[in-house]
Swiss-Prot record:
CDD domains: DMB-PRT_CobT (cd02439). GO terms for molecular function: nicotinate-nucleotide-dimethylbenzimidazole phosphoribosyltransferase activity. InterPro entries: Nict_dMeBzImd_PRibTrfase, Nict_dMeBzImd_PRibTrfase_bact, Nict_dMeBzImd_PRibTrfase_N, Nict_dMeBzImd_PRibTrfase_sf. Its EC number is 2.4.2.21. SUPFAM superfamilies: Nicotinate mononucleotide:5,6-dimethylbenzimidazole phosphoribosyltransferase (CobT). Belongs to the CobT family. The lineage of its organism: Bacteria, Pseudomonadati, Bacteroidota, Bacteroidia, Bacteroidales. It comes from Porphyromonas gingivalis (strain ATCC 33277 / DSM 20709 / CIP 103683 / JCM 12257 / NCTC 11834 / 2561). Coiled coil: none annotated. Pathway: Nucleoside biosynthesis; alpha-ribazole biosynthesis; alpha-ribazole from 5,6-dimethylbenzimidazole: step 1/2. GO terms for biological process: cobalamin biosynthetic process. The active site is at E312 (proton acceptor). This is Nicotinate-nucleotide--dimethylbenzimidazole phosphoribosyltransferase. Pfam families: DBI_PRT (PF02277).
Length: 345
């Protein structure tokens, strides 16, 4: 797999950041997670005056062979149909990006559809959907590497345009199934606790989904390494997000993590480079049943809990104003000395 140069942020500036935050005109710790965010972002950017520039939400999209087994509420063609809605500006993520000042980037990583030329979508299609991992490996090693590299290159392009904060979204019918497989293999959590309703399955649908994934897990004869798992049970859009997250960390960008699927992508990325988590903020806890368990496993503190299960980066983008508030706090609040206020604690 492509190699990255990721290091934890230098801690030499930590005490100066803490002193700056603690000397703002407020009781120490009274702004809670805003103070934690300001410290984290200051460490990432290595400055007492961090700035957020040109935020991007990148949506990687691809199809999944496992969708043929009826594990999703939606038929496979919904993937390309939703992309058309993104392109038309009428989807949930479109209004959120407009509201919060994000540039929306769409990437075809492996949709089983041929879009006409001239659309505002980046073509990095590795293949038209993955193979069905109930019966065979979803991807070859070469295809996995191609996807990771493509995701990294998309993020590099965003960085070159002045972006230093990025969120990731996805579109791909049945990708909650693939996420459940990653979660179970990479955490050791029982598969049953990793499988949920996805885009809207009823209890019978969830039972069928679990049985299919359980059989796929039993059929798997690989070595169980992270690289083997994310290849055999691969999702092209998910692997591109893995590469994108790792590249963002290498470039010192702030990563806003979305829901269940993107949290699994960070989990996979962290298996190779644990330091990637130092650059990540968890936007929200989604409504997919496995997400809360996964966040707990990763010792993550999500900023929001709104019952979202849309994907697309929606929860990450919704959380952005909180992140902006943290940066505004450290840059705009007066210290006790500036405010001529006695330090009262």
């Amino acid at each position: 797999m492509k190699t990255f140069n990721i290091k934890s942020p230098d801690q030499a500036i930590r005490q100066a950041l803490i002193d700056r935050i603690d000397n703002l005109a407020k009781p120490e710790g009274s702004l809670g997670m805003l103070e934690e965010l300001a410290l984290q972002i200051g460490l990432i950017q290595q400055t007492l005056s961090p700035r957020l520039r040109n935020p991007h939400n990148i949506i990687f999209a691809a199809d999944h062979g496992i969708a043929d087994e009826g594990v999703s509420f939606s038929p496979k063609e919904v993937t390309w149909q939703v992309i058309n809605n993104f392109l038309g500006g009428g989807a949930g993520i479109n209004f959120l990006c407009r509201q919060h000042g994000f540039e929306l980037v769409l990437v075809d990583g492996g949709i089983d559809f041929d879009f006409p030329e001239g659309l505002d979508i980046i073509d990095r299609k590795v293949r038209k959907g993955t193979r069905n991992y109930l019966y065979e490996a979803a991807l070859t090693g070469e295809e996995m590497e191609q996807a990771v590299t493509a995701g990294a290159e998309v993020v590099s392009d965003c960085h070159h345009r002045g972006c230093n904060v990025v969120s990731f979204g996805e579109m791909g019918v049945a990708n909650t199934s693939t996420s459940s497989m990653w979660m179970s293999f990479l955490t050791g959590i029982d598969l049953k606790d990793c499988v949920g309703a996805g885009s809207g399955l009823d209890s019978e649908g969830v039972r069928h989904k679990y049985n299919i994934l359980k059989q796929a897990k039993e059929n798997y004869k690989g070595n169980g390494s992270t690289e083997d798992v994310i290849t055999y049970f691969g999702g092209l859009e998910m692997l591109m997000a893995v590469g994108g997250m790792l590249q963002a960390a290498e470039l010192g960008m702030l990563i806003i993590v979305d829901g269940f699927i993107m949290t699994n992508c960070l989990l996979a990325a962290s298996q190779f480079y644990p330091e990637v988590c130092d650059y990540a903020v968890f936007g929200h806890c989604g409504d997919e049943s496995g997400h809360a368990r996964l966040l707990e496993y990763m010792k993550a503190k999500p900023l929001l809990n709104l019952g979202l299960r849309l994907g697309e980066g929606s929860g990450a983008v919704c959380s952005y104003p909180i992140i902006v508030s943290a940066v505004s706090m450290i840059n705009e609040m007066h210290t006790f000395a500036q405010a001529a206020v006695t330090k009262y604690f």
